[in-house]
Amino acid sequence: MKDYYAVLGVEADASDGALKSAYRRRASEFHPDRNPSPDAAQKFRETQEAYDLLSDPAKRHDHDENRRRSLLENPLATAQDIWKTYMNKLVQ
């Protein structure tokens, strides 16, 4: 399960304004017209996907419930995903 909050670089309790600001910053950073990196297009799509989900209150609520349930049902896999996301952020 993707951590869309990590994709945008915000906390789970981020306001709508913080989400929008993070989305604009990341979209600008990874837009294929502005970033020649081979993985920029993929990161741009992930950023769009994360914002589309988190900007819709119903989808965001469902996502938060799935995150909570995932942590309770499979803590090792969730911890590994969190650690992987953290390490990827460090090397960027």
Question: Would you name each region that the model predicts?
Answer:
Residues 1-92:
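C-terminal accessory/regulatory regions appended to core domains
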